[in-house]
Structures are given as C-alpha cells and as structure tokens.
Amino acid sequence: MSALPPQPPPPLLLLLLALLAAPAALARRAESASASQPEAEHQPPPGPGNATQLGSGMAGGGSSNSSVDAVVTRISSLLRDLPTLKATVIVACAFSALLIACLLLRVFRLGKRLKKTRKYDIITTPAERVEMAPLNEEDDEDEDSTVFDIKYR
C-alpha cells in the first residue's frame, strides 16, 4: 500500500486563493471606476476645427469615417476590458505554473522511490518485465532460502 502525499495546510491554500483573486478584484475595481465616469468627459469639446472635420467627413461620404469609428470602438472596448483580460491571463499563468511545479515534484519523488533497493518485498511487476537471478548459486542444497537479484526493465 502506498501512502498518499501529505495535503498542504488550509492557511496555505487560503493564501494562494487570496493571491490569485487579488488581480481580478483590482481589475473589477478599476473597471467600475472607469464605467462610472460618463463618456462625455472623455471626448474633447467641439471646437471650430472639430466641427469642420465632422461636417466635411459626412459630406464627403461616411464610409471612411464609419470604418474608423468601428476600429476606434473596437480598440476602446479592448482597452476598457484590459484589466480584466490581464487579471485572467495572470491567474491562468499562475495556475499553470503551480500545476507544472506539482507534476515535477511528483515525478522526482516517484523517481527516487523506484531507485531504492527493495529487500524482501513482494514482486508486483508483471513477470515479463522482471529478470531474476539467484545470488546464492553455491548453496544448492538449501532450496528454501534462495535470494534473488531482481532487475526491472
């Protein structure tokens, strides 16, 4: 029977969850602060130069102006959601790094266990993967206590 690896203590898990949740909470706070400000504050007030540009753009045909507006709205929506996206990427990277570290730790611990010499143990490996050679070939009269050298393939 193999023993299960020890579970990390609950305070460590709580600290890990707090560290992972902090970027998301900060992103939500920044997003709510930017959403509470009206859109009129972000746009410059119309001046003589702006009024002529808007009028000439509409008069010349609105297709180029509408494509520019579409690009601007896409970019502004990405910039508005940037803290949330950043927090999501940070959490995903942290989770991936934690998973890789756990798997590497498990592989190295398992490798150390397999390399240990086992004396007087029950062979649980299938017979085709085990080579057995008697160590005490000179004492053939005592057949009850044959010691084997076991090599695993």
Curated annotation (Swiss-Prot):
Keyword Calcium: no
Record topological domains on the Extracellular side: 28-84
Its membrane topology: Single-pass type I membrane protein
Region (Disordered): 31-67
Compartments (UniProt record): Cell membrane; Golgi apparatus
Glycosylation sites: N50
Protein keywords: Cell membrane, Glycoprotein, Golgi apparatus, Membrane, Signal, Transmembrane, Transmembrane helix
Main location: membrane
InterPro entries: FAM174-like (IPR009565)
Gene Ontology annotations for the cellular component aspect, listed alphabetically: Golgi apparatus; plasma membrane
Pfam family, one: DUF1180
Keyword Ion transport listed: no
Biological processes, Gene Ontology terms: Golgi organization
Signal sequence coordinates: 1-27
Segments in the Cytoplasmic topological domain: 106-153
Transmembrane segments: 85-105
Function, as annotated: Essential for Golgi structural integrity.
Similarity section: Belongs to the FAM174 family.
Name of protein: Membrane protein FAM174B
Top-level taxonomy: Eukaryota, Metazoa, Chordata, Craniata, Vertebrata
Gene field: Fam174b
